[in-house]
């Protein structure tokens, strides 16, 4: 597994690198924190571990840059005790978030879970679902409607897949949260709401924002 570890604390970087390499992860770091994208593009990581507080530009800035060109899974690290950091990370399309200090074995478990969730279907045939007059490509995280195509983050696609496989049925928020994250403590009602809102915003680009209905106090429903 190729891991890009964007961490400016060299002591922590070396500790994590040593631990991750014991699990056969290939870990790369950053030499110039003004050129994170250069390393990102040359190393081609399968997962990015991204610190929030970095020199020159913060982790949120680099997350935006990465999302412009890739849906690679991103796990944020932060020493700040600020719930809005979690919300911001979800708004930007991150897959998980951990607050420092943390147990390394928990980080490794999260990385393994993310890898399984994101890459377990890469060797399988193309997987598609039909929803209204659109085709949802689960292998490419895309939705095609006519000549229009939109691309979703992995998290958004997981939410959508859960909903459209249970069309016209209410899916509880707890069900979605359980499917998304192994560590449910990471997810609040607000972070799930943020993800659904981001999904709806993308669906609006193909005039399908009303296809997912909020059932207040119950969950969400995708209409046939």
Curated annotation (Swiss-Prot):
Protein's cellular compartments: Cytoplasm
Gene Ontology terms: biological process: regulation of DNA-templated transcription; response to antibiotic
Taxonomic superkingdom: Bacteria
Alphabetized UniProt keyword annotations: Activator, Antibiotic resistance, Cytoplasm, DNA-binding, Phosphoprotein, Repressor, Transcription, Transcription regulation, Two-component regulatory system, Virulence
Modification 4-aspartylphosphate, positions: 51
SUPFAM superfamilies the UniProt entry points to: C-terminal effector domain of the bipartite response regulators (SSF46894), CheY-like (SSF52172)
UniProt xrefs under Pfam families: Response_reg, Trans_reg_C
Entry annotated with the keyword Cytoplasm: yes
Mutant phenotype after disruption: Decreases the resistance to vancomycin about 2-fold.
DNA-binding region: 126-224
GO molecular function, one term: transcription cis-regulatory region binding
Primary location group: cytoplasm
Annotated Response regulatory domain residues: 2-115
Gene Ontology cellular-component annotations: cytosol; protein-DNA complex
Residues modified as Phosphothreonine: 128, 130, 149
PTM comment, free text: Phosphorylated by GraS. Phosphorylated by Stk1; phosphorylation increases the DNA-binding activity of GraR.
Gene3D superfamilies found in the cross-reference section: 3.40.50.2300, Winged helix-like DNA-binding domain superfamily/Winged helix DNA-binding domain (1.10.10.10)
Entry function: Member of the two-component regulatory system GraR/GraS involved in resistance against cationic antimicrobial peptides (CAMPs). Upon phosphorylation by GraS, functions as a transcription regulator by direct binding to promoter regions of target genes such as adhesins, exoproteins, transporters, toxins, and proteins involved in cell wall synthesis. Down-regulates the expression of many genes involved in RNA and amino acid synthesis or glycolysis.
PANTHER family assigned: REGULATOR OF RPOS (PTHR48111), SENSORY TRANSDUCTION PROTEIN BCER (PTHR48111:SF27)
Assembly with partners or alone: Interacts with GraX.
Protein name per its UniProtKB record: Response regulator protein GraR
Gene source species: Staphylococcus aureus (strain NCTC 8325 / PS 47)
């Amino acid at each position: 597994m190729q891991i890009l570890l964007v961490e400016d604390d060299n002591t922590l970087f070396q500790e994590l690198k040593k631990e991750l390499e014991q699990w056969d992860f290939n870990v790369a770091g950053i030499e110039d924190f003004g050129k994170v994208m250069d390393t990102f593009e040359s190393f081609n990581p399968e997962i990015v571990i991204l610190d929030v507080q970095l020199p020159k530009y913060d982790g949120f800035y680099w997350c935006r840059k990465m999302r412009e060109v890739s849906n690679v899974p991103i796990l944020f690290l932060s020493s700040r005790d600020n719930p809005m950091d979690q919300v911001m990370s979800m708004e930007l399309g991150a897959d998980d978030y951990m607050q420092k200090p943390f147990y390394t074995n928990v980080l490794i478990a999260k990385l393994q879970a993310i890898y399984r969730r994101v890459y377990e279907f890469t060797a399988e045939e193309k997987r598609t679902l039909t929803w209204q007059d659109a085709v949802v490509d689960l292998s490419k995280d895309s939705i095609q409607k006519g000549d229009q195509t939109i691309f979703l983050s992995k998290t958004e696609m997981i939410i959508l897949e859960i909903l459209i496989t249970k069309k016209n049925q209410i899916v509880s928020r707890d069900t979605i949260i359980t499917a998304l994250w192994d560590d449910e403590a990471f997810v609040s009602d607000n972070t799930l709401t943020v993800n659904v809102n981001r999904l709806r915003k993308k669906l609006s680009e193909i005039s399908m924002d009303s296809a997912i209905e909020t059932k207040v106090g119950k969950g969400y429903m995708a209409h046939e």
